[in-house]
């Protein structure tokens, strides 16, 4: 059986999780796209207020019960959530979540190296 190369997927989430279910839905979609290889070819960039998805207290996040089911998988995979330089960040991050601040150049590089890009 021939080896099929993995597709590099970039998911950019800018939707405000405190106002819209789109941010949690974007993470659910990212989980599905990364599930074939435990997220190894998946990059997630959070901009705007999207970093609140990774807050220690997500009680104000729309669809937080769905978020609570999916975040542990990303933590298990060791997925690094990249935080855009202009993003609003929560006062306290969720423990064990891999957080990486990123530069505009790193974001541009992620777009260039991705085979597929989804923006929410």
Where are the predicted features?
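Low-complexity intrinsically disordered segments
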Residues: 96-120
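Residues at the starts of beta-strands that form the adenosine-phosphate
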Residues: 8, 41-43, 80
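Histidine-anchored nucleotide/phosphate-binding helix
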Residues: 23-44
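Short beta-alpha junction loops
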Residues: 47-52, 86-89
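Positively charged, low-complexity intrinsically disordered leader regions
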Residues: 1-5
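Short glycine-enriched, charge-decorated loop/helix-capping segments at active-site entrances
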Residues: 57-62, 97
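A glycine-rich helix N-cap at a beta->alpha junction
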Residues: 60-87
């Amino acid at each position: 059986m021939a080896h099929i190369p993995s597709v590099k997927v970039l998911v950019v989430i800018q939707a405000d999780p405190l106002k819209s279910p789109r941010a949690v839905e974007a993470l659910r979609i990212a989980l599905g796209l990364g599930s074939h290889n435990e997220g190894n070819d998946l990059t997630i960039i959070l901009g705007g207020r999207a970093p609140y998805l990774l807050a220690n207290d997500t009680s104000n996040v729309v669809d937080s019960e769905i978020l609570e089911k999916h975040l542990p998988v990303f933590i298990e995979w060791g997925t690094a959530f990249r935080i855009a330089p202009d993003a609003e960040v929560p006062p306290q991050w969720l423990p064990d979540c891999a957080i990486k601040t990123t530069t505009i150049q790193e974001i541009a590089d992620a777009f260039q190296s991705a085979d597929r890009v989804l923006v929410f």
